[in-house]
């Protein structure tokens, strides 16, 4: 059983959609020996998909790790140059090319599929179960196709909702972080029209509380929280929308009464809140919807290299 006090925690990595980029990202990341100085990683996925990803790496002139198929966490080597794979055996061998020179058979490489969605869902479910059983200390997830998991009959809008369901968590939110910039969201994977409808006092208050507790868990004794407005200029006293007046401000007032630190004591205009956060005014921002929080964080955290035609973190 994993001990949370060990210097190198055991990290369970869900492989992601086998027909997506998860297998290649996993192989690339675990080819870096320095990863093993910080943690003990193992992959929950399929040996066949990772084998193909290793062949892709070799074709690109990279040194591919050796795959070690395991049946339980106790079987793992946790050795640089070796990837421990808890193989769920969900991918038929004929779904993955035997050679990089042959035409890729369906459904490999053709986008969302029921087969890929079912496999990806089971990888995520398994790492959650391992964590709940304390066999691993933390989880890391690769990308899944939300369309594919729904095709497979698992009706979730993303990882966050899957984790909430299998951990019996009723109040939760997605948090993104890059360096000192942290963001939680009142809503995520819903239409913009529905996102506006979800800005309600109880939900905003829940997210403020979650943000406060998350920062404390990260070692910030008295987190300074910003709560973004929804409308341009926070609605200009109702000229451009009244959510700030009727929903967001009441949540802020209730949070302040609980002793939560919200320095501005009011919604912060969305077009300036992240600049202030980057300048150190706030430890975390409560964003009202998906893109309001995701765009600034991804602008900060990712750079597109035009010459190399790829993203760089």
Where are the model-predicted features located?
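A broad detector of the eukaryotic-type serine/threonine protein kinase catalytic domain
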Residues: 168, 188-191, 232-235
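A generic structural signal for well-ordered coil/turn residues at beta-strand boundaries
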Residues: 79, 171, 180-182
């Amino acid at each position: 059983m994993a001990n949370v006090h060990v210097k190198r925690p055991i990290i369970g990595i869900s492989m992601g959609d086998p027909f997506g980029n998860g297998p290649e990202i996993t192989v690339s990341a675990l080819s870096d020996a320095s990863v093993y100085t910080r943690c003990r990683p193992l992959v929950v996925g399929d040996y066949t998909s990772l084998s193909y990803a290793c062949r892709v790496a070799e074709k690109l002139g990279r040194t591919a790790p050796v795959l070690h198929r395991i049946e339980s966490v106790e079987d793992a080597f946790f050795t640089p140059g070796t990837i421990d794979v808890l193989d769920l055996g969900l991918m038929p061998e004929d779904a993955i090319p035997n050679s990089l020179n042959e035409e890729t058979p369906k459904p490999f490489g053709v986008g969302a599929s029921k087969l890929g969605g079912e496999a990806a869902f089971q990888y995520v479910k398994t790492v959650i179960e391992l964590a709940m059983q304390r066999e691993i200390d933390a989880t890391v997830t690769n990308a899944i196709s939300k369309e594919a998991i729904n095709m497979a009959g698992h009706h979730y809008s993303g990882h966050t909702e899957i984790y909430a369901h299998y951990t019996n968590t009723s109040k939760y939110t997605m948090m993104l972080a890059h360096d000192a910039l942290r963001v939680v969201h009142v809503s995520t994977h819903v239409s913009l029209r529905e996102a506006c409808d979800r800005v309600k006092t109880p939900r905003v208050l829940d997210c403020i509380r979650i943000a406060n507790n998350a920062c404390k868990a990260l070692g910030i004794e008295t987190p300074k929280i910003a709560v973004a407005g929804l409308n341009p200029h926070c609605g200009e006293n109702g000229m451009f929308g009244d959510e700030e007046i009727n929903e967001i401000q009441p949540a802020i007032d209730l949070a302040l009464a609980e002793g939560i630190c919200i320095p501005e004591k009011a919604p912060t205009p969305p077009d300036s809140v992240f600049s202030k956060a980057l300048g150190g005014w706030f430890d975390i921002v409560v964003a009202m919807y998906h893109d309001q929080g995701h765009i600034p964080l991804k602008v900060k955290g990712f750079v597109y290299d035009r010459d190399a035609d790829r993203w760089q973190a």
